[in-house]
Amino acid sequence: LDHKRIGIIYSIMGLWGGLMGLSLSFLLRLNFTDPYYNLIGPEVYNYIITGHGLAMIFFFLMPVIIGGFGNFLLPLLLGMPDLSLPRLNALSAWLMLPSVVCFGISLFIGSGVGWTFYPPLSSIPYTGVGVDYLMFSLHLAGLSSILGSLNFITTIFSSIFSQLSSRISIIIWAYLFTSILLISSLPVLAAAITMLLFDRNFGSSFFDPMGGGD
């Protein structure tokens, strides 16, 4: 697959995730229409808040803006036929599909954890597999973003070394610094989610003060 087709795949995945987030947003606003009658239960409401935020960030904005537009714009602005690592680019694109599927499955299983994955709230009251599906979905989305960022950084640096850096467009620098920030921050989120998964399923105490965790 060339970069244009992969950009289309990213855009389709992003639009799909955006529609999921939009439907969750409609449910939230529908719940606010009558202050004396709650259409949605409190636990499901918490999960919809969590799912809405994650869908808009990880499954709409990042695939469309970074994956979709990036795959179209970077080779065009750099004067290259494709990105430096096309197979890695295809792998990062196809990882979005199981990520979105796991997110969709988690919508119908269990309840959510509110605005954030606050570890005590995620471990004790919410013991269903819905939170685990959502964390696995975040793992896949983060892995896809890291692989795509590595591809962008490799492509941009190989182009910078072959031509004057003053001729590089500012949007290329924006993609470069965004990719560096993603590679720096996403492993921290992945480590925290992994520790939380171990606390929930394997009896560890990374986040449990009673067991020596912090």
Q: What do these predicted regions represent?
A:
Residues 1-214:
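Membrane-embedded and interfacial regions of multi-pass energy-transducing membrane proteins
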